[in-house]
Amino acid sequence: MSKNFEWISPDFDLLEKEKTAVKPPSMYHVVLNNDDYTPMDFVIEILERFFSMDIERATQVMLKVHYEGKAICGTFTAEVAETKVAQVTMYSRENEHPLLCTMEQA
């Protein structure tokens, strides 16, 4: 039989695990910002399409954007938040709307 593993110490315990603290990933809010040009119906469509909101919730968030200047659409890990911002921005530009979507650390 081959002795390929002679270099492993006989004191080595395969069941021994090093305890490491695993931190949860940083989270980010995806935020829609108000402008004077994007129609309210389009904002609702964005919220339904990209954030899986029903019509009632999408309308509430749209009104918050309209009256308060911005609203959080969701909270995600950095990669997911970046993707959502890019999708919303691209879809808005394709439809000739200046809707501003940003991300902020939660």
Curated annotation (Swiss-Prot):
Domain of life: Bacteria
GO biological process: protein catabolic process; proteolysis
InterPro entries in the cross-refs: ClpS, ClpS_core, Ribosomal_bL12_C/ClpS-like
Coiled coil: none
Function recorded in the entry: Involved in the modulation of the specificity of the ClpAP-mediated ATP-dependent protein degradation.
Subunit structure: Binds to the N-terminal domain of the chaperone ClpA.
Family indicated by similarity: Belongs to the ClpS family.
Protein name: ATP-dependent Clp protease adapter protein ClpS
Source organism (scientific name): Vibrio cholerae serotype O1 (strain ATCC 39315 / El Tor Inaba N16961)
